[in-house]
A protein has these predicted regions:
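Short, small-residue-biased leader/transition segments that mark boundaries at the very start
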Residues: 2-7
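C-terminal leucine-rich, beta-strand-based interaction scaffolds used for sensing/assembly
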Residues: 8-184
Length: 184
């Protein structure tokens, strides 16, 4: 863990901003790309740094903004999160969870956190096309909800609202009330 912190500090610095207010860089990336079950897969983790690096190359004039011997400006990591999320959702929907595409279309533009009852209405099996109904992981909206929970795509808060972690938020076309605008 200590070595990982040291590497991350050298890449982007100790903090995601000038002060600890925006978070420590060591925990920021995993906290923002883990699913609702706290699982972190290597591909999105690595892609976050890859996408951020590619943006740094495109904006080489900002290399002068780098502090000391750092390699990345933290805002590029924050911006990469949007692309990583979109990429992760494409992976899911192109592989074994193609039924999610119609749910994504229904949820696009909605704001999280959402009341559970409202969210469940988007899961009503009758809303899916006949073709996709056969792919659904359940016959009721509650069964589909349970699968989304198990997959880590959604989480339920203590006050029974539904939340979506950032690894899926942007790929689903969702917004977060009071959320910060991500750089592109």
């Amino acid at each position: 863990r200590q070595r990982q912190m040291c590497i991350r500090d050298r890449l982007i610095g100790k903090y995601m901003g000038k002060t600890p207010k925006k978070g420590k860089s060591y925990s920021w990336v995993p906290n923002h790309i883990q699913d609702a079950n706290g699982e972190l897969t290597p591909r999105p983790f690595l892609k976050c740094f890859s996408f951020a690096s590619n943006e740094m190359i495109k904006h080489s004039d900002e290399l002068n903004d780098l502090k000391e011997d750092h390699l990345l400006v933290p805002t590029y990591l924050q911006g990469a999160l949007v692309t990583v999320s979109e990429d992760r959702v494409k992976e899911l929907t192109s592989e074994e969870y193609q039924w999610l595409t119609e749910l994504i279309d229904r949820l696009k533009g909605k704001t999280m956190l959402m009341e559970k009852d409202e969210f469940l209405e988007y899961l009503t099996p009758d809303l899916w096309s006949e073709e996709k109904k056969d792919e659904l992981p359940g016959r009721t909206k509650q069964e589909i909800y349970s699968v989304l929970l198990a997959l880590g795509i959604i989480m339920e808060t203590s006050d029974s609202r539904v939340n979506v972690p950032e690894i899926y938020l942007y790929g689903f076309g969702l917004k977060r009330k009071g959320g910060i605008r991500r750089p592109k």
